[in-house]
Each structure stands twice: as C-alpha cells, then as structure tokens.
C-alpha cells in the first residue's frame, strides 16, 4: 500500500492514493498510522479519491452540496480516527500531490470535501514544493464565545469555515506571551454552543498587517498550523478593527499564510511540501484494524 507524506506550514499528513476508494480505513487504522511512535506520524490522513468513487464505496452516503461526481474528493480523517469536514492546509497538500503524481495536470480544479467544493489554483508545483490558493468559501461569523486555554480565559468569535472555530483575539497578548502559552493542554469551552467540539485559535492583535496565531484542533490537540483556523483568525482580527473584508498575513508556528476575506468568499494561499513516499506493510495495516 503506497503512501506519501507532506505538510502545509508544518500541519502534516499521510496521503493514501485510493482513487477507486477500495481501501479499508477504520478509525483504529487511522489513529495507528498517525501515531508518531508506532506509525508514520501525522496530524491527519488524506485519502485521495473521487467523489463518485467515494459514494459508490459507501465512504459518502451522498455527494456533499455543490460537489460534482467527477470532482476529486479529499477524505480527511483526524489523528484520532474521526472524520473531519475540512482542512485548508490539507487541500493545498492534496492538490500538490495530484499535480506531482501526474493524476492532475490542470492549474485550476476542484477538490471536494464534506464541507463542499474547494476550488484550487496551483501557482507553482514541482515534486517537492508548491504554492497553492484554496477558495475556502464564505466564512460565517456566528457570535461571541469563550474558552480557557492554558489557564487563560479568552473571549472570541465563533466562525464557521466549513468546520467550527472559536477565534480568540487578546489585544493584550504579545507574540512572546503567545509562544509561552500552553495551547497543547485540554481546552475548556461551552459544549452547549459547540456540541461537536471546536477548534480554538488564540491570536494577537494585528500589527503591520500580520497576526500571530496558535491553535488547538479538536481531535488532535495543538498543531503547527490550521488552514481553516487561519481564515477564522483573519475574520476575528478584521472584526476587531470594525472591518468585514481585507487581506492579512497569519503567522503560525509552521510559517506564514495569506488570507483574503471578501464579501463573497475567503482565499487561503500558502506553501505545500511533499517530504517522502513509500510503502506501508500490508501485514501491519491489517493488524491495526482492531
């Protein structure tokens, strides 16, 4: 069983090319593969398939709204084995892999997800590096919320980016204080407001068009980056200045991305790196089913 390993601003993934969607992919197998000691190690799994194949194989019960049968489909799983609606960094890496592997030759195409279609533009791609913009769709502000992160109580803005986020901007937080915050510890939030959990971003006030951010992803813990989280952070940073639209650089531990919030949509541009490829032992894979 072949695989590739890649990352988008150090949010890392194992890619499993499975165009016909024939691969068994249990929660236990995903968790084992993502384990950094007994598996390959990753923040998540990206199964590379098509929307019609995913439906035919029962991976999807039906096509997500706006996704066409012939679209590529990113079957994304969190490191704990749960299914996730969207991952902006994952879409960039997914699109990069399609180009690098020769499965796709176009510069512009659509990647389907549980959250709907995500059009991508590949500005550059070689076997190792790529620069990709993802149309993330409209990010919707849902209202205020609160979280406790690393013992610090924070107020934030709930944002739907195809998955739930609580982006907490603390105007008194310096980049140095943000770096020292224990974002990896369990976070507290209102479970009535977020019954399926929430991704929590902590960010500084913007300075010279840049905001610094760290994120605790549901089902994973702290990651070096979160694409949808950077969009939520940009929405919150703009809102704090009384703005609905604008372009910001979001600086996460894994690097910088550019987020453009418009009236109609949100655009996420950033790098992708393909690190390795190889084969997973079939015997090991079978042993992880239980």
Curated annotation (Swiss-Prot):
The active site is at 87 (proton donor), 226 (proton acceptor). This is Diaminopimelate epimerase. GO terms for molecular function: diaminopimelate epimerase activity. The record marks 165, 217 as: Could be important to modulate the pK values of the two catalytic cysteine residues. Keywords: Amino-acid biosynthesis, Cytoplasm, Isomerase, Lysine biosynthesis. The gene is dapF. SUPFAM superfamilies: Diaminopimelate epimerase-like. It comes from the Bacteria. Its main location: cytoplasm. It catalyses: (2S,6S)-2,6-diaminopimelate = meso-2,6-diaminopimelate. It is an enzyme of class 5 (isomerase). It is found in: Cytoplasm. It holds the Pfam family DAP_epimerase. One of its GO terms (cellular component) is cytosol. Catalyzes the stereoinversion of LL-2,6-diaminopimelate (L,L-DAP) to meso-diaminopimelate (meso-DAP), a precursor of L-lysine and an essential component of the bacterial peptidoglycan. HAMAP family: DAP_epimerase. Belongs to the diaminopimelate epimerase family. Signal peptide: none annotated. Homodimer. Its EC number is 5.1.1.7. The keyword Repeat does not apply. The keyword Isomerase applies.
